[in-house]
Amino acid sequence: GIWQDMTSAIAQNRDIAVDGVLRFANDFDQLLENAGGDGALATLDSQLVDGLLTKNAFREKVGEIVGWQDTALNGIGFQSYLAVHSDPSAGSDAQDQLIGVLTVQGGIVESGAGGVDVANAEMLVDQIRMAKDDDQIKALVMRVDSPGGSAFASELIREELAALQAVGKPVVASFGPVAASGGYWISADADAIYAEPTTITGSIGIFGLVPNVSRSLDAIGINADGVSSAPLARGLSVVGELSEQAKKILQLSIEHGYDEFIDLVATGRNMPKASVEAIAQGRVWSGTAALEIGLVDELGDLEDAIARAAELA
């Protein structure tokens, strides 16, 4: 599972036993007592860090490695670094053979402002269309870090990706920390899917939620009433109880959406529907487990996905 992958990675990177990592996690109180209450010393004793330095001493240590420019560390700013490395084809003869990278980060919504916590489907669709119309871009890598969101918005993105594939441009999905529910919906048809071992993915399912404050209003003596031309004319009111008819409509709609999700995954992953149903029902999987059950093709990072896209292009 994710915990085993994480502790193994820490142990390997620090060249220590996994038991030492587990002891730090499970018995930190004892380690802290042994270190006289000094958390930094307890971390050093557990070999999770190489040394303890003040900020100034650390700066001097870095200076010994990278050198100095007068009184400043010898280095470049982050923006300057990006300016040099932003174009992977810079300095090569492959200017007309580019791999596009599309980032889908945050909850998936139909429209509205984008940002760290929001993946705007309208903006993403426009970007995918630009990649489709750009003759220099031969394939697209979609980096997904999303817990999902609107099923409708997810389908808009998936349809545009399908249009990109239809003109002969492969799509490779690269999963970050989370690629679940709608995040998997948009990825299921990809030509290849890469995940990190600790990625949380799957969550093949749909749910609906209708907020209701009628009991809260009752508690303070406020009642809602009204007349309508038909039983469903009032829509889904937050101040009244859902009718049995409305509940039935919601349930049927959700079940239909779930069936579509199952069909989509079965088609995209070339799996029988029964096999998808067995691993669906909203359950989440680590990247390692997802590889075993066929939800992803390879374990790897963004660079691995880009390399695969280049092979497919």
Give the ranges of each region predicted by the language model.
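C-terminal intrinsically disordered, low-complexity extensions immediately downstream
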Residues: 304-313
